[in-house]
């Protein structure tokens, strides 16, 4: 009987653990890419040259104006030299270059960079103000000094609650966006 109780408890914990799911997401160029996620979080992408450490949105407020920008961090493998790092948003019909670093610097074994600031308004960043869940997909490409290129795709997902938290961080005027 005692073993049966422990088995039930153990199965309860296993049943509560988020399962890994593979999800196909369409990207620019009429293609789709498979992503692994656990719960609502996508697994960080990696290949034999580098691994994604961070891909996410940050907020910035100055002089009463609200901004957002993307922040990316990768960790190159020990034998990988960086000559150029490019990050493209491939969520839409065409890729959009958001970062091109022609002189990447490694600090504490990582490369990190932020995109330019974008005004956080419903007209300029409409997905942030939509109540629907949003998935953004980025292609991160590393070019090495010998011209060798390698790329990974990284997805990020924002549900309605996460978007609301971003708007709260930015300021009271963005907490209740206008109805579309």
Language-model-detected regions and their locations in the chain:
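Contiguous beta-strand segments within globular domains
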Residues: 50-78
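Bacterial Sec signal peptide processing site at the extreme N-terminus
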Residues: 15-32
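Short, solvent-exposed, Trp/other aromatic-anchored flexible loops in extracytoplasmic proteins
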Residues: 102-147
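Short beta-strand elements
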Residues: 148-180
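Proline/serine/threonine-rich low-complexity linkers at boundaries of modular beta-sandwich domains
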Residues: 27, 42-47
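Sec-dependent bacterial lipoprotein signal peptides
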Residues: 1-18
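Extended low-complexity, serine/threonine- and proline-enriched intrinsically disordered segments
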Residues: 77-103, 140-142
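Hydrophobic residues positioned within well-ordered beta-strands of beta-sheet architectures
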Residues: 68-72, 83-85, 136-140, 154
